[in-house]
Swiss-Prot record:
Main localization, broad class: membrane
Region entry Disordered, spans: 383-403
Protein's name according to its UniProt entry: FERM domain-containing protein 3
Protein's UniProt keywords contain Ribosomal protein: no
Gene Ontology terms, MF aspect: cytoskeletal protein binding
């Protein structure tokens, strides 16, 4: 029998869901309430069952919006440890949520479209506009002063329309909470652009111009993950349509494009990126606050790489973050890729759905600015989650410093929407080119993985001083041993040798009796002995194979394939080379000491 429709009012929106329900009490107890916060801060609530999968909830939200280009979006939730997660479509919602119902989730943009011009429907562009608006307010979208003023003017034009002196007082911009920190200078510039440059633009046009400007910025689409690098410096990792990016302060210090990313993996709290730089393989390591944060970072990287890199979803394979001898986590992105989404959008032939815009004017007192970025990690100015995001996703804590006004630099390009459209029609060939402003310039630096790992250089003379040969008393004393002493030592040596031979015969006889069954042994000891023998045999086989792979110059195809795997390179650089240098140093020291003697 069918259950009645559940329609729960929340905010300004409601949502209807129909599901099967039996008349048993057990079935009724399996119903769970779920609240989803939308991009305009309204909420919808529904009831789900224990077996309901994540895709069911995503589809119902998209049906509520009448959204067809839904592959850009996802649902995010937070576990009791304040760790964020993306709801997986193919898994049960109940099994993914580690809290008791009712559940609270957020509907957000998961994959940012690389080319806003290829978005077919106005509804999709409006939802992306709301996400960009949130990113601007939360401090995730860094930009110059002129770009910030233009983005703010687009938001004002989209929500208020043309400037009207009768309706808009002198300080009308101060009623809008657009940026984490708005100066009067920035507000005056927004008013100037709103009055003179955007007049006559409808809300869809103003929103589209904002997307054209935002997608040219370096931090467009970056969801920052706070980490520590090998030197202990706080960095923010992100994934964009171009590739894997690393930020320190207000600058992008590293970019590896998706075709050059060989593998993403994690072990405990350490996240590894193995990629190609100038035809040479390099491995970057970053440390997160918890293993759960590291796994979330890895899964986000795997999904973004699959979405932006591949031409077809059939090319996506299951990825394993495995160690050399142990099985690790396995994960596979199950959605469409960017090219498939664009192709599907081009085939949409329906009448565009009506877009219900919410005219939201946020007051400055509606948000608290006293939340901390992440537990046990020092916050930085760039890419900080917003106060409202922290209320949804992160624990309470101390205040977060906000970007200062003097950190906003001179304009980079004109704020004219016509010029912005022209810039999009002729985009730069490389994302890291044509960046010329300070101090918010995001500059591409040459990455040297050994620069921060090697100790201070030491001269050869100083190294030799570390291995000074000590004086030996044997060289200074005379040979005073007599013939009688030497003969006595020889007799003692013969006696000791005979005793050792007797012990060896007894050990061999005992081993033979055990093998033939004349002596009964504990089965546990016998199993352990067999395991020890097998382990020694494998060691005798694996050790020569490793030497063959590491030291020989044999150019066989299967040996080359093994040498080129990221796991083997990690073992070679992190374990084998240090061990080899240590052994070589000890041998060099012994030979040097023997040479001195």
């Amino acid at each position: 029998m069918f259950a009645s429709c559940h329609c729960v009012p929340r905010g300004r929106r409601t949502m209807k869901m129909i599901h099967f329900r039996s008349s048993s009490v057990k079935s009724l107890s399996q119903e769970m309430r779920c609240t989803i916060r939308l991009l305009d801060d309204s909420e919808i609530s529904c009831h789900i069952q224990r077996e309901t999968k994540g895709q069911f909830l995503i589809d119902h939200i998209c049906n509520y919006y009448s959204l067809l280009e839904k592959d850009y979006f996802g649902i995010r939730y937070v576990d009791p440890e304040k760790q964020r997660h993306w709801l997986e479509p193919n898994k049960s919602i109940f099994k993914q949520m580690k809290t008791h119902p009712p559940y609270t989730m957020c509907f957000r943009v998961k994959f940012y479209p690389h080319e806003p011009l290829k978005i077919k429907e106005e509804l999709t562009r409006y939802l992306l506009y709301l996400q960009i608006k949130r990113d601007i307010f939360h401090g995730r979208l860094l930009c110059s002063f002129s770009d910030a003023a233009y983005l703010g003017a687009c938001i004002v034009q989209a929500e208020l329309g043309d400037y009207d002196p009768d309706e808009h007082p002198e300080n009308y911009i101060s009623e809008f909470e657009i940026f984490p920190k708005q100066s009067q200078k920035l507000e005056r510039k927004i008013v100037e652009i709103h009055k003179n440059e955007l007049r006559g633009q409808s809300p869809p046009v103003a929103e589209f111009n904002l997307l054209l400007k935002a997608h040219t910025l370096e931090t467009y689409g970056v969801d920052p993950h706070p980490c520590k690098d090998s030197t202990g410096t706080t960095t923010f990792l992100g994934f964009t349509a171009a590739g894997f990016v690393v930020f320190q302060g207000n600058k992008r210090i590293h970019l590896i494009k998706w075709p050059d990313v060989c593998k993403l993996k994690f072990e405990g709290k350490t996240f590894y990126v193995i990629g190609t730089q100038k035809e040479k393989k390099a491995m970057l390591a970053f440390h997160t606050s918890t293993p759960a944060a590291c796994k979330h970072l890895w899964k986000c990287g795997v999904e973004n790489q699959a979405f932006y890199k591949y031409a077809k979803s059939s090319q996506i394979k299951t990825v394993s973050s495995s160690k050399i001898f142990f099985k690790g986590s396995r994960f596979r992105y199950s959605g469409k890729v960017a090219k498939e989404v664009v192709e599907a959008s081009s085939k949409i032939q329906r009448e565009p759905p009506e877009v219900h815009r919410a005219n939201i004017t946020q007051s400055r007192s509606s948000h608290s600015l006293n939340k901390q970025l992440i537990i046990n990690m020092e916050p930085l100015q760039p890419l900080l989650p917003s106060p409202s995001e922290q209320e949804e996703e992160l624990p309470l804590g101390e205040g977060v410093p906000l970007p200062k006004e003097e950190n906003i630099s001179a304009p980079l390009i004109s704020s004219s929407p016509v010029k912005a459209a022209r810039e999009y029609e002729d985009p730069p060939s490389e994302e890291e080119d044509k960046i010329k402003e300070e101090p918010l310039t995001i500059s591409e630096l040459v990455y040297n993985p050994s620069a921060s790992l090697l100790p201070t250089p030491v001269d050869d003379d100083e190294i030799d001083m570390l291995f000074d040969c000590p004086s030996r008393l044997e060289l200074e004393r005379e040979d005073t041993d007599s013939f009688e002493d030497l003969e006595a030592d020889e007799n003692a040596f013969l006696i000791a040798e005979e005793e050792e031979l007797k012990e060896a015969r007894r050990a061999l006889s005992w081993s033979y009796d055990i093998l033939t069954g004349h002596i009964r042994v504990n089965p546990l000891v016998k199993s352990f002995s067999r395991l020890l023998v097998v382990g020694l045999g494998l060691l005798l086989f694996v050790f020569p194979l490793l030497l063959l792979l590491l030291e020989s110059g044999i150019d066989l195809s299967f040996l080359c394939e093994i040498r080129q795997t990221p796991e083997f390179e990690q073992f070679h650089y992190e374990y084998y080379c240090p061990l080899k240098e240590w052994v070589a140093g000890k041998v060099h020291l012994i030979l040097y000491m023997l040479g001195c003697s």
